[in-house]
Amino acid sequence: MKFGKYLQRRQVSAWKKKYVFYKSFKKQIKSIKRAKTEEELYIGNESQIQIELTAIPINKSISKIPPPSQSSSSPSQSQSQIEIPLQSIEPTTTTTTTAATSSSSSSTTTTNVNSKTIINSSGGSIKSNNSNPLSQSSIIQRGPVIIRENNIEREEKKFDSMLQEEFDKVNTFFKQQEDEFIHQFNDIKQKVVAMSEICKNSSSKSLKDAISEDSPRLGKFSHLFYNPSIIKKRNSSNLTSSAIKDDGVGGASSNSQRYAQSSPSSSSSSSPSAMAVKAIAHAANAETYWNPGSLKLGKIRRSLKRAMEENYREIQALKEYTSLNMIAFRKIFKKYDKVLQSDSSVDGMKLVQQQYFVKSKKLVVIEREIESLYTNTFKHGNRRNAMAKLRVPKEYNAPPKVVFLTGGLSGMSLILFIFCIRYMINNVAIIYFDSPTPLHFLSMFMLHRMIGIPILLLWYFGILLYVTSGKNINLFLILGWDARTNITHYHILFLASGLTFLWTLSLFLYTYLAIHIDGKLPILFPFLLIAIVLFIVFCPFNIIFRPSRYWLIHTFARIFSAPFLPVKFKDFFFGDQFTSLSIVLSDLEYVICFFVSDLWTDGDICWRINPYIKPCLVCVPPLLRALQSLRRFKDTKQNIHMMNFGKYSLTMLSTVTSSIANSKLLTDSSHKKGTLALWIIISIVSTIYSLGWDFLMDWGVLRTHSRNFLLRDHLFYRHKWVYYFAMITNTLMRGSWTINVSFEALSSRTKELIVLATAVIEVTRRFQWNFFRLENEHLSNVGKFRAFDLKIPDILNTQSQQQQQQQQQQQQQQQQQQQQQQQQQEEIGANELLGNNGEPIVGDSKTVITSDDFINGTSKQEGTIDLDRAQFQYSKNDLEDKIEESIINNKNNNNNECTPFSENSFYNNDHSGDENSNE
């Protein structure tokens, strides 16, 4: 694999613009090579022209012209000249190579003069238009070579400037990310140590109770625990490390000592209690996405554990960023040496070794610190288990048996499906479900439809993962996957092939046995299919990708609790998938009713109640998405989410209107036609609304000012026709509801085939929609250079909100009392400075000074001083006496202790020992 493809495959996609522009350097080196070749060709052509011109005289007078060294003729003397167009000799490209320039008196010389080159074949001097003739040693005589030399120097400077720009870019980005990751680690470390201190004897209690028990140890800092009113989102551009200072790169040992001092056992200032106090003090500045008001200690511990694992993955990615850039620079210098046949790679790599992103050893220190803290805190000192959990596994390559089983199961499934279609066409009234042969065929059809549509979506999702992994789309960030336990497209396709084989086997056995055997035995196989699928989804054992299954269950649990939890991308992304599977809920209700009632009574109760329950169940997925939009509007206060709410409201209205139009509630044909017309109008409006949202919001296309016609500026897929094709097909598949109008004359049971067709079309449309939705989200993250999603949980408040409000009221009352007391003291001090008649004390020298002026030894000439309420004039001498007297009284009242000077000591010279004086 070439390094360019290797770099594109291994790089963090969100940091793509921050890597070395390897292709640009390759192009620059190729241009240098091309310039060198053209320069050699120019020298060869010049010598050939010289030979031809000296061999063939132009006229007889040329032989009579003496050489330049022997000629004494003036510049105005007539000379024989030949004019040749410039484009036949002058090069057209700029180069960075050097050329030797030497010319003899008998050689032919060229010069650039207003798009023409004049060649003097005899005299050696060149005469150009609008210029005086110059001697052979003139710089114009060597003009073409010097022009090439200047072009070579310019290209070399361009290469050097590109190199310096890349150094600056890589160093700046590396330093920024390094500071951010170190800041995150310090925050996590403080909270881990604080939690270890708090949770020693309270592992089974809530964090609120544990903190209330440990509040005597925390002292006055207990009120600094989590408070939602002071939470701020940290600005990543201003992140600084509190444990590691930017003192250059040299001195990894000093960094190690600095981190050794920050460990709990290194100094008294870093003891567990001190770390707890620091964690509490910095809790308000941590980045959080949820309110952990009811979290248990164990959940907080797991959150910190995941945060530390994510921080470790960030550091590993930044280290790989360094190594890839080093390899890129080495490849560039080697290619430069190969093309120019030089030996500059050694000096170039020395220059690379001096860069900050190579010399910095802070990440190594942090990496060891994380490993040690994680091992001792979460793995009880077992380093092997800790490293197995911290390290991200390498890229998964499916073993041959997995690929073989996937292909084998897919092939057998296809064969079984063909046999099923053959049996149903020959023996089953597949178009008219009212036929009694085979028994309960309609119920089994709906059962297999309920399972088959999600299996089809699973196949589509595996293909989606295959394409996105090849395009290096960061699904770990977008969907919130764990990089250590995630499944790849190999696993998804293998699971889909296995489920497809079970599905076709169940359908084949039921169809074959139902034709040849009477009774309920054939229904056993569809029932076993349901049992196997439920076991695979909810299996509690650590088999069949349990972390991924639990992640999916957790995601759908968040979807169903939409109004009560903040909405993440994975929530509304899989909520959209769920809207395409709305028919599955209706089939699920029918299947449950069948196994509970109709299977044993041979009745059709389920079919009679299905038209009334079906619209309610079909409206559940869009209702959940509408509630998610309301929650996002509540959190963000953006009106765009209310527009999304309107889209799903129209979808629900269209579903309800369609159910009413097709139900038996309307006996009058005119009312039924009117309801049908209303449904068509609502469906058209809903389709246009949804298409506009798909193109403008979800895909980000239809930009009128884009450089790509009706698309957007940045496209992730290479071929533009893919976007236009997707826009057309998405429009057509959005209108799949019109099929129901075309087959309105069919019976309600026969329409179940139409429902199957529309469901397959909708799932296919969603499959296509997913590509461009994930692309748009990925480009948004790339624009923000966001590659990781690290969430640090905050510590809870020890008091309820009512107690907090009471505390705030008490603090406000205390502040008001202190202000009133200060005002009274100021009035007392002002009255003391007034005479018996209420006039200010006046001396010979009037000067306005303040306490600061007195301390600094400065004063202002006559004026006034505003002491909040008292405004007066005073004598400087009397003021000095008052201050000295006040200082003496303060010393006596405080047992000769040194008391700092304050303005209150001046105002309260008779009350210096009072409790309210601010000494």
Curated annotation (Swiss-Prot):
SUPFAM superfamilies according to UniProt: beta-sandwich domain of Sec23/24
Bias type Low complexity, positions: 70-132, 252-272
One GO term (biological process): intracellular phosphate ion homeostasis
Pfam families registered for this protein in UniProt: EXS (PF03124), SPX (PF03105)
Marked site positions, Important for inositol polyphosphate binding: 22, 26
Transmembrane feature ranges: 401-421, 450-470, 492-512, 521-541, 676-696
Record key words, sorted: Membrane, Transmembrane, Transmembrane helix
Annotated segments matching region Disordered: 62-137, 242-272, 891-919
Cell compartment(s), UniProt: Membrane
Polar residues bias spans: 898-910
Annotated spans, Important for inositol polyphosphate binding: 331-338
Keyword Transferase: no
Domain (SPX) ranges: 1-350
Domain named EXS: residues: 605-806
Cellular component terms (Gene Ontology): plasma membrane
Membrane-topology annotation of the record: Multi-pass membrane protein
Function: May play a role in phosphate homeostasis. Binds inositol hexakisphosphate (Ins6P) and similar inositol polyphosphates, such as 5-diphospho-inositol pentakisphosphate (5-InsP7); these are important intracellular signaling molecules.
Domain remarks in the Swiss-Prot or TrEMBL record: The SPX domain has high affinity for inositol polyphosphates, such as myo-inositol hexakisphosphate and 5-diphospho-myo-inositol pentakisphosphate (5-InsP7). Its affinity for inorganic phosphate is tow to three orders of magnitude lower.
Protein name: SPX and EXS domain-containing protein 3
Species in which this protein is naturally found: Dictyostelium discoideum
